[in-house]
Amino acid sequence: MEGLRPSDRLLSLLLTVGGLSLVLAQSECNCSSVSPGVLAGIVLGDLMLTLLIALAVYYLGRLVPRGRGATEVTRKQHIPETESPYQELQGQRTDVYSDLNTQRPYYK
């Protein structure tokens, strides 16, 4: 194991520990074992089925029009505009703030 990289060492350690637990589990029970080919087929089938479901949901989601966005746009177009409760700006009015225009010595 001197020529192995750290990742290879970790992989070999995990495979060894996993293999030992598999042997111990088989010796303790009378269960039928699953071959690695069957296990790989189950995992790949599950991945393919998951991908197929995700793609079907994506494409069906694109076919269905968006319910909320479409109704909000049409609803907003039918609402008549109301007058603004705010007063329009009239420009600068010096008479309103003329009494504040005094200069105090501590602001200089």
Curated annotation (Swiss-Prot):
The record marks 50 as: Important for interaction with transmembrane receptors. The chain crosses the membrane at residues 37-57. GO terms for molecular function: metal ion binding; protein homodimerization activity; signaling receptor binding. One of its GO terms (biological process) is negative regulation of B cell proliferation. Residues 1-25 form the signal peptide. Residues 71-108 are annotated as: Disordered. Coiled coil: none annotated. It is a single-pass type I membrane protein. One of its GO terms (cellular component) is plasma membrane. Keywords: Calcium, Cell membrane, Disulfide bond, Immunity, Membrane, Metal-binding, Phosphoprotein, Signal, Transmembrane, Transmembrane helix. InterPro entries: Tyrobp. Ca(2+) binds at residue 46. Residues 58-108 are cytoplasmic. Residues 26-36 are extracellular. Residues 84-108 have a biased composition (Polar residues). The keyword Cell membrane applies. It is found in: Cell membrane. Adapter protein which non-covalently associates with activating receptors found on the surface of a variety of immune cells to mediate signaling and cell activation following ligand binding by the receptors. TYROBP is tyrosine-phosphorylated in the ITAM domain following ligand binding by the associated receptors which leads to activation of additional tyrosine kinases and subsequent cell activation. Also has an inhibitory role in some cells. Non-covalently associates with activating receptors of the CD300 family to mediate cell activation. Homodimer; disulfide-linked. Homotrimer; disulfide-linked. Homotetramer; disulfide-linked. Homotrimers and homotetramers form when low levels of partner receptors are available and is competitive with assembly with interacting receptors. They may represent alternative oligomerization states or may be intermediates in the receptor assembly process. Binding of a metal cation aids in homooligomerization through coordination of the metal ion by the subunits of the oligomer. Interacts with TREM1. Interacts with TREM2. Interacts with CLECSF5. Interacts with CD300LB and CD300C2. This is TYRO protein tyrosine kinase-binding protein. The lineage of its organism: Eukaryota, Metazoa, Chordata, Craniata, Vertebrata.
